[in-house]
Amino acid sequence: MSATAEVLVISSSPERNPVHTPAPPAYDPERLFGLSPVDVETTPLPSPSDLFCPPTHSRFFEVGNQVDELRRDETRKKSSTLTNDDSAVTTLEGEPATDKPKRRGRPKKEQKRATEELGPCVTGNEKTTTKKTITGTSKKRAQPATKRSKQANKTISGRVAKAGTPQVKEAGEKAICPSTPTTALPLKATNDVLEWERDGLQLEQAMTRRLDWTPTVNKVKEVVELEGKSGSDDNTRGFGNLLSEYGFNGAAAPVNDFMASVEGGPTKRRRIELVDPGVYPAPRQSVADDSEKDNTEGTRKSTPAARKKPTKRANKFTTLTARVTAKYINESTEGSDVVDEETPKAKPKVSRSKKKGQASKSYEPEFVVLSPEEAAKSLDDQELVFGTCSQLEREDSPTTIRELQAAISESERSMTLEASGRPHRTQSKGSSSTVSRFNGSGNLWSVASRDVDGSLMQVEVVDLVNSPDRSGTITLDERPSNAKRVAEAECNTSDINPTQKGSDQAKAASTSETQPVVPSTTQSKNKKAENTTSIARKPDPKMPQYDNFTDAQLSKQAASFGFKPLKNRKKMIELLEKCWKAKNSISSEANNENTDQETPAEPESAPEPGNKPKGKGTTRKTTTKAKAKTQPSTSSKSTTEAISTTKSPSNPNSNTTTSTSTSISKPTPSYANVEEIEDSEEDSDPISFPSPSRLLPQTLQTNHKHAHTLPTSNLPSSPNRTTSTSVPKEPEPPAILLPLTEQITKAVRAQSAAHPASSNSNKTHTRKQTWHEKILMYDPIPLEEFTTWLNTEGLGLVNEDREVGAGFVRRWCESKGVVCCYRPRKKE
């Protein structure tokens, strides 16, 4: 038995010694920590990692594991069989055993006591040394077993079960060692974990509470509670349950919070932003009502009705502000509910007020949703109306529209009476030209302005502004003999030489100073009488066949007109045809243009200061269409000579009033259409282009007038074809500047007239603005773009072939008061 025991002990002896345990003198506690000298027989620290742990025998005695207890029992049984062999003990321990007698009945009790106490290994007491000597054999027998259980993979059976547990335990011991006391380590570690789980110390929930400790969900519920008080008790219980973790009383705390929130709002910030105690004193009274509800039972009967009312009112809130501030104003909602109860009675009265028109004024101060008609009436009574300038200007005098309509109706009534009293007005040619504005010209403007009876309403605005003009039309009928006399005189002088004719027309111009409307009628009759002679005298030149020309000839013709040769032959031919037509029309109508340039200083200043001639826009419409290109050059020049001689000493202030009727002799149909649009603009737009005479400076008008009266006085006595064709070439060079200014004005207006439908459409934001609209809106006009538009498209609308430069356009803009600028050059 002893031999076999020795073999067993020797075979396991290399495994028993700890591999990484250093020599005892190397880690002497006296040398390392400066401790008091200890007994030599004490066991040294097992490893460097255990230096910072309290010294213990836990490396050789496993702590708190039932599997290790079973192993110790096995080792005790083995140690009891091997106690007789002293040599084996000396070989196992590496040092001789003590001389004290060994008691075999004590080792089990001492070993149990050591496992329970786990006393420190570094002590200065003699008890520990004696205890070690007494239990030396038991420890020496237990150490191989424990070491085998840690290594546990060489000779002992059950390797699978014993391989995992000691290694896990060794790691667990190192983790528990620095944080827990050694005496109660296993029990306290397990008990603390159980207590944490039982008490509910959950760090994740604590972190969320730390980050968001204000109960936001309860705040939302409390806001809902303020509107409807019926379910407040249930919600207060839930609020107390939520705060049970914080140790609050579930019944008392929500009541106090609720009372405070009624006075000042749920939070301090809301009270500052939304509630002002001086403006809304109602919540305090509602708190007093709530206290009365708790004290008395009689008021409890009225509370259900009061609770139902806010729910009815809440559906009628239409704004976000009303929804938010509803819970702060309790009494105002009750007052508004009283109004709501009266609204069904007020509705039939509102319907009656549509017939009567006065019954609804008593209900205006109440908070009732009004019909659109009633809302419009209430807007009239407001002191402050915020809107655009046009709305505010209209609000200054509410009776302006009524007075305007009354004045329009009176003017229509007076006009119908005059028309019925003088039926010959529509029959006579002279009177029809002046009164044609009242009779209508058959265009879109006249068709659109009709009243209920179908009669024309063209003079709604014009007659209101120029109301004294009716006296000017009456003078035509009061003095018909003078008009007939002048007309007969001019008809008789159509065959006489131009000198006599000029003198007669000078007399006619002198009579026109007393009779403002007569010159337009006499000139129209004079032109009418000479249409046949002008047609016979005026030849129509033939257009050359540009299709037969070569490319070189076409380019030469284009250069003569001032254009560069184009690559496309077809486009070049079309361009030359347009240029030829425009040039011939200008040459045949140059005399008429000269008369137009001279007549701005013409006899319509003669009417009295308050009277504007009625034939202003209508004579243009009637006469220019009938006599577009049939005007004779000699007769027109003689009339301009006579008129200029009679009118030269006249008052220069007449230039502002005499421009529009002088366009009678302007022949081109395009210009007639433009002037027709100008009439509509003068009627509607206060900011429109004034007439050319108003735009040009006084010095330019006088210089231009005197410059062109000189060549017209050198006309021969007998008009013939040569004079009519050769004379227009002479005044053309000095007349380049001024006609171009007028042509630019015509081109700008012609563009707006070319798109009347698009200008009246609702989708104005998708349409590109015309130059006229930009000028009216005071937009800065870029000179480069405006010049290119005039040269490519604009001047072509008025049959003008000449081109303009940016400097000339700038002078035109400055003379018209148009805002213009050059494009800024990009820095390279």
Curated annotation (Swiss-Prot):
Which residue intervals are annotated with compositional bias (Basic and acidic residues) in the record? 68-77, 476-488
Q: Name one GO cellular component term.
A: Slx1-Slx4 complex
Polar residues: bias regions: 80-90, 428-439, 491-524, 710-727
Keyword DNA repair on entry: yes
- Post-translational modification (record): Phosphorylated in response to DNA damage.
Biased composition of type Basic residues is found at 101-111, 138-151, 306-315, 346-358, 613-628
Report keywords, A-Z: DNA damage, DNA recombination, DNA repair, Nucleus, Phosphoprotein
Q: Where is this region: Disordered?
A: 1-183, 261-364, 409-439, 468-551, 586-734, 749-768
Q: Does the keyword Membrane apply?
A: no
Output the GO biological process annotations, alphabetical, semicolon-separated. DNA recombination; DNA repair; DNA replication
Concerning InterPro entries, the annotation shows: Slx4_ascomycetes (IPR027784), Structure-sp_endonuc_su_Slx4 (IPR018574)
Output compositional bias ranges, type Low complexity.
Answer: 629-670
Q: Acidic residues bias located where? A: 675-685
Question: What would be an example GO MF term here?
Answer: 5'-flap endonuclease activity
Q: Which domain of life is it from?
A: Eukaryota
> What subcellular locations does the record give?
Nucleus
**What is this protein's function per UniProt?**
Regulatory subunit of the slx1-slx4 structure-specific endonuclease that resolves DNA secondary structures generated during DNA repair and recombination. Has endonuclease activity towards branched DNA substrates, introducing single-strand cuts in duplex DNA close to junctions with ss-DNA.
Query: What family, per the record?
Result: Belongs to the SLX4 family.
Quaternary structure annotation from Swiss-Prot or TrEMBL: Forms a heterodimer with slx1.
What's this protein's name? Structure-specific endonuclease subunit slx4
> What taxonomic classification does the UniProt entry list for its organism?
Eukaryota, Fungi, Dikarya, Ascomycota, Pezizomycotina
This protein's gene is called slx4
